[in-house]
């Protein structure tokens, strides 16, 4: 699977080893609705999208190497998602090293019309430059594909 993002991929860590995150792909893309969405490739070669997360706009990097949607602490606060300090029980590997994260569930994420409800996500405590649109969203779509010009998301 190609990664559309940078080396800032999020992977769950268990014990001393890295666990492969299993992303459930529903038979009929359960929870996905709407219309096909187009994401234009940025001048930097990455796929940046304006996501509507729980009713608010958040700029995200599309990253198939991220097992889940990952929110920066600042984006989470703007969305009204404020995990308690003791909720940061997870550990994730980023390009910056191992950091703590808090699991959350987002009501809805929509990118240019491709909507997914009840999306699992992580709020990364620190060290994440920008929020990532990972496989907990992408894996619930019926399909997504990349071309040199852009990315198509199909609910």
Region locations from a protein language model:
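Pepsin/retropepsin-fold aspartyl endopeptidases
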Residues: 1-59, 64-155
């Amino acid at each position: 699977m190609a990664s559309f993002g940078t080396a800032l991929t999020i992977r769950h860590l268990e014990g001393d080893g890295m666990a492969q995150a299993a992303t459930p792909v529903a038979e009929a893309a359960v929870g996905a609705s709407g219309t096909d969405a187009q994401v234009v490739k940025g001048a930097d070669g990455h796929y940046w999208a304006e996501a509507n997360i729980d009713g608010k706009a958040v700029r995200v990097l599309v990253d198939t190497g991220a097992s889940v949607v990952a929110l920066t602490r600042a984006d989470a606060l703007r969305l009204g998602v404020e995990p308690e300090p003791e909720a940061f029980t997870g550990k994730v590997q980023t390009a910056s090293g191992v950091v703590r994260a808090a699991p959350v569930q987002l009501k809805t994420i929509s990118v240019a019309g491709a909507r997914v409800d009840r999306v699992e996500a992580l709020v990364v405590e620190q060290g994440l430059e920008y929020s990532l649109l990972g496989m907990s969203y992408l894996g619930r779509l019926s399909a997504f594909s990349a071309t040199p010009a852009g990315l198509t998301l199909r609910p």
